[in-house]
Structures are given as C-alpha cells and as structure tokens.
Amino acid sequence: MAVDMELDGGGDGKGKAPPQISLSGLFLACMVAGGVQYGWALQLSLLTPYIQTLGIPHALTSVMWLCGPIAGLIVQPCVGLYSDKCTSSLGRRRPFILTGCIIICISVIVIGFSSDIGYALGDATEDCKVYRGPRYHAAAAFILGFWLLDFSNNTVQGPARALMADLSGRHGPSAANAIFCSWMALGNILGYSSGSTNDWHKWFPFLMTRACCEACANLKAAFLVAVVFLGLSTAVTMVFAREVALDPVAAAKRNEGEASGPLAVFKGMKNLPVGMPSVLIVTGLTWLSWFPFILFDTDWMGREIYHGRPDGSPAEVTAFQEGVRQGAFGLLLNSIVLGISSFLIEPMCRRLGARAVWVMSSAVVCVAMAAVSVLSAWSLGDFGGSVQDAARAPAEEGGVRASALALFVFLGLPFAVLCSVPFAVTAQLTASRGGGQGLCTGVLNISIVVPQMAIALGAGPWDELFGEGNIPAFAMASVFAAAAAAAGVVLLPKVSVRSVSMAGGH
C-alpha cells in the first residue's frame, strides 16, 4: 500500500552540521563521481566482450559479474555503516572515498595489463595477431582485477552518495542530485568515448606488445587515462568536501551497546523508515529489468546487430569488435541524454510526483526491452534466428543498426530516473528519522545487488538455451519492467512536492 508522507531535509543527526558550501563548491565536491563513473563506463562497455577474447565462453561471462553483487552485499552496507560512525580527522566519508579510489587505480592497471601478465606467467608465446586460442593466465589476472574493481567501486559509491546528502545544505538535495548525475553523465561520456575510440594504439604504439594487439592496447590506454582522471577528481573532492569530524567521545557514547559490522546492518534493516520496505521491493524489480541490458548491451551490438563472434574467423572478430565500438558509441549518446535529463528529474517530480515518474520510467523500459528483442529477431530473422548462423552472413546495414542506436538514446531518460529517484526517495525517508544516510544507502544497494546476482547466475545459461544470443534475457527484462511499474503503483510511498525539493540524495 502506498504511504503519504511529508518529509523535510536535514543533516544526519550525528555531530555538528557541515559548514555552508557554495553551489560551485558543491559541484567540485562531487567530482569524484565523474572519475569513478569513467572507469565504470569502460567496465560496462568493454570488459564483457574483452574477456571472451581471452577464452571465457559467452555463457560464463555473466558469472564474472557476480563480484558486483557480492561486493555490494558485503562491502557497501558495512562501509555505509562505518562511514556514519567514522571519527577520522578527514571526516566520515572522505577516508573511504580516498581508500576506494586508490584500489580502483590498482585494479584497472591489472585489468589493462592482464594480457601481458598472462604472457609473463606462461600463456601462449605466439604473437597475438595469429594466436586465437585461450589465454587462461591472462583471464585469471583479468578476473582478479575485475573483482577488485567491483569491490573498490562499492567502497566509494555509498560514502560518495552520503557525502552529497551531507553537504547539500541550503541548496537542497535535489540540486545535489542534479550535480551528481551531471558528473556521472560526464564520466560516462568520457568513458564511452574512450571505449568507442579505435586509435589509442596509434597514439600510444608502445602499449602494443607480443601479447597485446590493437584492441588490447586500446583497452590498456583507456584505463591508464582513467587512472589519471580518477586521481584528479579524487584530489578535488578531498579538497572541496569540507566535512566536520565527529567527536570521538560523543560518538563512542552513542555507539555503546550497538551491534557492529554486518550485525548492525541487519539490525538496521529491521528498523527501516516507514515506506522503505516498499522502496526496496520496487528497486529490486526495476534493476532486474535493467541488468541484462547493462551487462550485455555492447555484446548484443557485436553479436545480434553486427553478426560477429569474439572467437570466430578474422572477419567475424572484426565485425564483433566494430559492433562493440558502436555499442560504446550508443552508450555515449545515452550518457548525453542522461546528462540533459538529470536536470529535468526535479521539475518532473514536482509536477507529477516521484512515484509517477518512477512508474512511467519502468513502463518506458518495458517497451524498450521488448523493442530490443524484436529488433534482434528482425536482425537475425533471415539467418534462422541463431547468432551462429547470422555470423556466417554479412552484417545487415541500414535500419537495424540505426534503430539499435536509437534505442540507446531512448533509454537515456529512464536511466536518469534510475540513477536519482530511488536514492532521493531513500534519503527523504531517512531524513524523517534524522540520520543514517550511509546505512540506508547501503541497505538500498542490497535491493540492487540481489537482482544482479540473479541475472549474473541465470542470464548466461538461459541465453545458452537459445543459441548463445541475448534475446531471451532482454525479453525477460521487459517482463520485469512491467512488474516494476505495477508494483510501483501499488507500493511506492507518495512523497509531497515540497519534500522532493527539500530532501533526498543520490
């Protein structure tokens, strides 16, 4: 049942209020979101296709993404809890942001140089231009870096969102939401631009080695740029996010007798704000509808739209890589729409209500995922509906590819809703309790990572039943989106217009 609520923003009730920050200062304080999102964009656009070139079959690539939900289930709630109670002189959030960003830099270097690491550990000595077989040492190094990247991403995300809610002050969390989404969009634009660029190996030819050819060198260079950008954005956030440290004595008294670690997380889940359980249910269904596309969008472009294969003939590999680059370009267009749309979310919520905006975005995703399935069937229709058969014929030009890119653009607005409204509603509910943004953001993340775990375990085998394509997962995503829209109508709290502009966090 929907709950009507009138909520006010405010601090988290733990320690002194942070000093007032200017709008430009708030903009710079959120810059770390752009740096993290740059690496995340590269991860989403390039790594699922790339791991297949190292010998991991398509059916198992989704299992690799299990690290995300596991990290989110364990790391982010605990980090959120500890950041609420942290008494460091740097403040509550910045120590976790700094630590996580350092680990992100290490992990992306491991990923970028995984082929060279595998070569040093005993992979095939043939030149990568002629060798098409598996490279298991490289795959192991890649997966290690991939998992480390997901754990470090989760270390940063919760505190970064909570920091934004802490600092929003007189500007209101909706303004902070728009700034945060803008940085996310900029990070996405830069990351997807890097991923769609095929000239990195020409600009930095020294990155090519016997184990690392053009596609690998492009990946390596893009991740090295990610390290530089993340380092810069982290430094700016550390300087401009002026937190007030908690008093250790007062914090110790407040925390006396409280459970710690995962026990405190589960205890917190038992005492959620009114309306929060409904938000968790709808969030879970919403993310079930998004994850197949998030995980397989560029692979879908390479296979179903461009009819390529990562482990096929040279012509098929070339077609697959071109599809992946076009998929990254589609994600770039999606991010531009995301950045523009982030400034439309607040007025839409004021006019229609957060619940209506959330429900309508789920309905749009339902239509879009159905369209992805239909477009894929159209592209493969002349080849018996099988990726293997389609890969033996020239990729279809014209309408199919243009329509595929149009779908990326079409999904920009609902993705902006996904990136802001659930977190804003969560922070609004938390504000009514007077604090605990870090913990509640971590609990919300559980409703995101559990669906991802289900998709990671089930999508690959499910698609394998239908010829190693992505159509079945996208069709199921359409069903989940319809369920999310229906659940949103029935369950989501009805938040007043005033509270949308006065409380929230991303």
Curated annotation (Swiss-Prot):
GO molecular function terms listed in the Swiss-Prot or TrEMBL record: sucrose:proton symporter activity
Cytoplasmic side: 1-20, 76-94, 157-171, 242-275, 349-355, 426-441, 492-506
Subcellular location: Cell membrane
Listed Gene3D superfamilies: MFS general substrate transporter like domains
Pathway field: Glycan biosynthesis; sucrose metabolism
InterPro entries: MFS_trans_sf
Membrane topology, Extracellular segments: 42-54, 116-135, 193-220, 297-327, 377-404, 463-470
Recorded topology in the membrane: Multi-pass membrane protein
Any one of the GO CC terms: plasma membrane
Quaternary assembly: Homodimer.
PANTHER family membership: SUCROSE TRANSPORT PROTEIN SUT3 (PTHR19432:SF39), SUGAR TRANSPORTER (PTHR19432)
Record protein name field: Sucrose transport protein SUT3
